[in-house]
Design a protein with these regions (language model features):
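Mixed-charge, low-complexity intrinsically disordered regions
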Residues: 1-99, 111-120, 124-227
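Conserved positions in beta-strands of structured domains
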Residues: 12, 104-107
Length: 227
C-alpha cells in the first residue's frame, strides 16, 4: 500500500552536505537551526501554544539516503561500521521509508515578513533543506523514560576527540559559530570506514570548509576556507 505524505517545512541549518552532521540530536547543543514552513502551511494558528513547550519532535526525511530497495541489516557507526544490526534496531538513514525522528530544543518563535512564522531550534542533526513532514511537542510525562535501556548503544560509550583549533583559524568563523564548530569536530565527523591517520578531511560548515587531520585521539584544524 502506498500513501502520500506532504512536506510541511524545511530545515535551514549550517550543513550544506551530510558530512559531519552529528549522528544524534543534541550531541552538540550549540548548533542552531531554523524551521521554515512551506507557503501552504504558514498559518500562525497551526503553532498556537507551541511556545509553551521547551522541546519538539521533528519527523523528517533522510533526503540524501533515498534509494530503491532496502536491506534488513545495517552497520551502525557506533559499533565501528563493521558489525551488522537489524535496521529497525538502529537509527540508520538507510531504511524502508527513510524517515528520521529528532528531538530538538525550541529556542523561539519568530514572525517574519517573507517566511511567516519560523521556529528557531538547537541541537538539530539535519542538513540544510531537509524536508520535514511533521512537528509534535515533546511531553515530559509521556516521553521521558529514565529506566529505558539503550541496547548496544549502552556499551558503545561516547568518545570525544581533543580539538586543536588554532586561534587565528578559529577567528575566521563568525563568533556565534565557533563553539558549535568545535563541538561538531570533537564528535569525529569522519565516516567510520574512512579513518586514515594523516589524511586531510574537509567539513563544510556555516559557509566554510574546515580542513583537519586526526592522529589517535587528537584532531587538528589546519585550514579554514570560505565556500
Amino acid at each position: 500500500m502506498e500513501v502520500q505524505i506532504n512536506v510541511i517545512a524545511r530545515m535551514k541549518s549550517d550543513y550544506p552536505t551530510k558530512f559531519g552532521i552529528p549522528r544524534q540530536p543534541h550531541l552538540v547543543q550549540e548548533l542552531r537551526a531554523t524551521i521554515v514552513f512551506e507557503p501552504e502551511y504558514r498559518n500562525a494558528d497551526a503553532l498556537r501554544g507551541i511556545e509553551g513547550f521547551s522541546h519538539l519532535w521533528i519527523i523528517w526525511q533522510f533526503s540524501e539516503a533515498v534509494r530503491s530497495g532496502w536491506s534488513p541489516t545495517v552497520r551502525p557507526p557506533r559499533l565501528g561500521g563493521n558489525t551488522r544490526m537489524g535496521v529497525f534496531a538502529t537509527r540508520s538513514p538507510f531504511r524502508p521509508n527513510n524517515l528520521g525522528l529528532s528531538c530538538v530544543k525550541l529556542l523561539g518563535v519568530e514572525q517574519t515578513k517573507e517566511q511567516g512564522t519560523v521556529l528557531h531550534v538547537s541541537g538539530a542533526d539535519l542538513m540544510d533543506g531537509t524536508p520535514i513532514f511533521d512537528i509534535k511537542p515533546y511531553i515530559p510525562y509521556a516521553d521521558s523514560h529514565p529506566d529505558a535501556l539503550g541496547g548496544f548503544t549502552d556499551t558503545a560509550g561516547e568518545f570525544l576527540l581533543e580539538v586543536d583549533f588554532p586561534a587565528d583559524l578559529l577567528a575566521l568563523l563568525p563568533e556565534g559559530k565557533r563553539a558549535a564548530a568545535i563541538g561538531v569536530l570533537s564528535h569525529d565527523p569522519r565516516p567510520s570506514y574512512q579513518r586514515k591517520p594523516g589524511r586531510i578531511y574537509g567539513l563544510p560548515f556555516a559557509g566554510f570548509d574546515i580542513r583537519f587531520t586526526v592522529e589517535e585521539e587528537n584532531l587538528t584544524v589546519c585550514e579554514v576556507v570560505p565556500l
